[in-house]
Amino acid sequence: SPEAMGKLKPLNIYGESKLAFDLFVAEQVAASAATPPQWAGLRFFNVFGPNELHKGTQASVVSQMHPIVAQGEPYPLFRSHRADVADGEQRRDFVFVDDCVGVIQWLLTHPGVSGLFNVGSGQARTFLDLAKAVHRASGRDYHPSWRDTPESLKEHYQYFTQAELTRLRRAGYTDPFTSLEDGVTITIKEFLSQPDPFR
């Protein structure tokens, strides 16, 4: 509802821009304004998977971490700068790209479904979990390595994200989401570690 969304406090301009549009849509729907026969706004969480190497530093941590780990080099994670969160225990909802595609395909085959939906796994996992999964899929032992969080990020750094999937499930989407470990294994073994990572 517009009231619920109005209480949200984005941490950065990117989040503010997404919320502003979602709020606009919610207000239009609440006012019974004309809408297309089907419409959907999807809020993707931390998407990872194959075919994102063109994104450079904006690629997922999985894609950035693997080539370093594969060479036997450490990939340092950000230290926590909060006393109540241990190093590496910062949590994100990492969602495999195939699952995002699955939601989109489902919407395309269910023209009666419209709305704003979160698209994530519904589980918050730690960066330590992610690092361990990348090392395991790369055939390397994991030894934690740390670096300080840049000062420019500290004020707006997210310590926890987790998709609330109730609206998506109530709309009828029932497919399970890929586990972090399985998604990382597919990404690395079937794509990133292959001679042609884009096949």
Where in this protein do the model-derived segments appear?
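Short, solvent-exposed loop/turn segments at secondary-structure boundaries
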Residues: 13, 52-57, 156-159
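Short alpha-helical oligomerization interface
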Residues: 2-10
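Catalytic tyrosine of NAD(P)H-dependent dehydrogenase/reductases that use a Tyr as the general acid/base
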Residues: 11-14, 92
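Active-site helix of classical SDR
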Residues: 17
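C-terminal substrate-binding subdomain of Rossmann-fold SDR/epimerase-dehydratase oxidoreductases
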Residues: 71-199
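NAD(P)-dependent short-chain dehydrogenase/reductase
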Residues: 23-102, 133-135
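Active-site loop immediately N-terminal to the catalytic Tyr-X3-Lys motif
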Residues: 9, 54, 111
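Active-site beta-alpha turn of Rossmann-fold NAD(P)-dependent dehydrogenases/reductases
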Residues: 11, 43-45, 120
